């Protein structure tokens, strides 16, 4: 009896038609894929991408050279050199470098920063041809902050109830 039912199933191509109708059901639905370089999917506000140093609205850099991000970085990818104290008693950085080859994008630097100076922005397209280009200095980080400030501020505002 088993061989008779298997013969009938194979004769009528039961599995083939089942797979065909399943394919046809999904063929006419909306596509789940996107054409990547030309279309981009949504990015979460908590996405951790390329690092950036932010500025205050008056143009002054936010980093106060407390070195908390350097101390908490598990990959030891951040190097900070603080300048002398200013007349108002605050400090600013003379050197702020991040070795993106070492960075593991954990976000601890962003969480440790008391003034939201160092953030991981929404940019994920920063591939390079050499390793040296992945060594971000202070000028590059400030440029990233200026370029992505609107998106970074929006993401921080969206995420603020959970911080």
Swiss-Prot record:
Subunit composition and interactions: NDH-1 is composed of 14 different subunits. Subunits NuoA, H, J, K, L, M, N constitute the membrane sector of the complex.
Do you know which InterPro entries this protein is assigned to?
Answer: 4Fe4S_Fe-S-bd, 4Fe4S_Fe_S_CS, NADH_quinone_OxRdtase_chainI
Q: Which reaction does it catalyse?
A: a quinone + NADH + 5 H(+)(in) = a quinol + NAD(+) + 4 H(+)(out)
Please name the top-level EC class of this enzyme.
Answer: translocase
UniProt membrane topology term: Peripheral membrane protein
Task: Name the residues that bind [4Fe-4S] cluster 2.
Answer: 73, 103, 106, 109
Instruction: Name all 4Fe-4S ferredoxin-type domain ranges.
Output: 53-83, 94-123
Look up the EC number in the record and give it. Answer: 7.1.1.-
Query: In the UniProt record, which is one GO cellular component term?
Result: plasma membrane
The cross-references to PROSITE patterns, in alphabetical order and at most eight, read: 4FE4S_FER_1, 4FE4S_FER_2
One GO biological-process annotation of the entry reads: aerobic respiration
Q: What does this protein do?
A: NDH-1 shuttles electrons from NADH, via FMN and iron-sulfur (Fe-S) centers, to quinones in the respiratory chain. The immediate electron acceptor for the enzyme in this species is believed to be ubiquinone. Couples the redox reaction to proton translocation (for every two electrons transferred, four hydrogen ions are translocated across the cytoplasmic membrane), and thus conserves the redox energy in a proton gradient.
Which cellular compartments is it found in? Cell inner membrane
Q: Provide the alphabetized UniProt keywords.
A: 4Fe-4S, Cell inner membrane, Cell membrane, Iron, Iron-sulfur, Membrane, Metal-binding, NAD, Quinone, Repeat, Translocase, Ubiquinone
A GO molecular function annotation here is: iron ion binding
Q: What is this protein called?
A: NADH-quinone oxidoreductase subunit I
């Amino acid at each position: 009896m088993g061989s008779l039912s298997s013969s009938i199933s194979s004769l009528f191509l039961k599995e083939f038609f089942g797979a065909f109708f399943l394919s046809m059901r999904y063929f006419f639905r909306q596509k789940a894929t996107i054409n990547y370089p030309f279309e981009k999917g949504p990015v979460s506000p908590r996405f951790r991408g390329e690092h950036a140093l932010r500025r205050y609205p008056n143009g002054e850099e936010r980093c106060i050279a407390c070195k908390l991000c350097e101390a908490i970085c598990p990959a030891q990818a951040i190097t900070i050199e603080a300048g002398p104290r200013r007349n108002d008693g605050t400090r600013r950085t003379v050197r702020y470098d991040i070795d993106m080859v070492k960075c593991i994008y954990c976000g601890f630097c962003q969480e440790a920063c008391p003034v939201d100076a160092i953030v991981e922005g929404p940019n994920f397209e920063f591939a390079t041809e050499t390793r040296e280009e992945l060594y971000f200095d202070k000028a590059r980080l400030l440029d990233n902050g200026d370029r992505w400030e609107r998106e970074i501020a929006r993401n921080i505002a969206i995420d603020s109830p959970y911080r």
